[in-house]
């Protein structure tokens, strides 16, 4: 009896959180004309996650970022929310999944600017060196993942 109760609770715990069940639900704010944003959305969908998009003009998108706590130094072309976190720019899905597994107290992750070779910004095999940063609740950041240049 105890083992079946434990098994039922374990299954419930795994299905209660989207981060643990494997299928996440992203809301992405972007401009209508941004091709790299659309490519990043496809990167997320290819990993099996659900994505809803909202097209905004640049001014509304900038205000949306500010409202979510994204400062100019962390900004990129699109802003997503997933399971209580903000994902700014071309952040790889593996970094997002690690964030949701570890659940640090933070606003979210950012790939500041538009790093060449990041998801949605592919340029053949080339990738510029760049960092994905954890944006903390106080607005500061620290390196979450570093990506070396690749030719």
Stretch-by-stretch model annotation:
Residues 66-151:
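Thiol/selenol-based redox catalytic cores and closely related redox-interacting motifs
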Residues 1-7:
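Bacterial N-terminal signal peptides that target proteins for export
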Residues 21-47:
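Local sequence-structure signature of Cys/Sec-based thiol-disulfide redox active-site neighborhoods
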Residues 40, 60, 92-96:
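Amphipathic alpha-helical interface surfaces
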Residues 16-18:
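N-terminal signal peptide c-region/cleavage motif recognized by signal peptidases
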């Amino acid at each position: 009896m105890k083992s079946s109760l434990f098994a039922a609770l374990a299954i419930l715990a795994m299905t209660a959180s989207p981060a643990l069940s494997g299928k996440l639900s992203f809301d992405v704010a972007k401009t209508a004309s941004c091709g790299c944003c659309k490519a990043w959305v496809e990167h997320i969908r290819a990993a099996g996650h659900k994505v809803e998009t909202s097209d905004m003009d640049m001014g509304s998108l900038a205000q949306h970022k500010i409202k979510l706590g994204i400062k100019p130094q962390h900004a990129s072309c699109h802003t997503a929310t997933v399971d209580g976190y903000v994902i700014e720019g071309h952040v790889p899905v593996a970094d997002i999944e690690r964030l949701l597994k570890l659940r640090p107290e933070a606003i979210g992750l950012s790939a500041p600017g538009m790093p060449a070779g990041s998801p949605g910004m592919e340029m053949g095999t080339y990738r510029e060196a760049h960092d994905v940063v954890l944006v903390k609740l106080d607005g500061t950041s620290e390196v979450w993942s570093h990506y070396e240049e690749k030719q």
